Amino acid sequence: VEKLDFHDVDYWDELTTLLEWSKTHVFSSFFICWAAQAALYYFYGVSKYLLSHKLTGVYLHHTNVEKMQRKILRGFDYQFYAPHSRYTSVSKEDIEKIDDLDILAESKEAGVYIVASKDGSRFFVTGHPEYDPDTLDKEYKRDLANPDIISEMPKNYYLNDDIHNEIQVKWRSHAYLIFANWLNYYVYQQTPYNLDELKER
């Protein structure tokens, strides 16, 4: 599905119906990986681009220090790790053209990572902070078993980049922070008790 044009995805109409519904029924939305790309395209017209090979592994990121006052970044170190597993990406230049969006974190290798609307109603995360320790391992071994896939070993994941060594879990504290911050500051504290008060955002 990731390599398909959005409009060629079988459930695109159903998905866009939900995205449109969220404008008036959801105070803050959090989109991950392909869903982040799809939502960026639907709400802002940001296209995705096919990479030359699968981006997979655990990559070093840095926060945008000028945006550290954003509550989603509370407790973040200036540098942190996060997993990625995808064949497509979005362009930093395309996002920077949109006044309503802020790039909050990115990676030299993996590109843009956290994008947020200025009002906090939408967050777009291009990686997978939710991944379990062994998720990338399972994906890699699945791909190895498929002769139609050119498998890529996850970078910075196995000790010394050796599949026979233990997995290095470097993203857990970041994962807890990003989800806890979003739920606390943008869902629990700001969603109005009367949902009829939600305005189109």
Roles of regions detected by a PLM:
Residues 17-20, 56, 60-201:
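Amide-donor transfer/coupling interface in amidating biosynthetic enzymes
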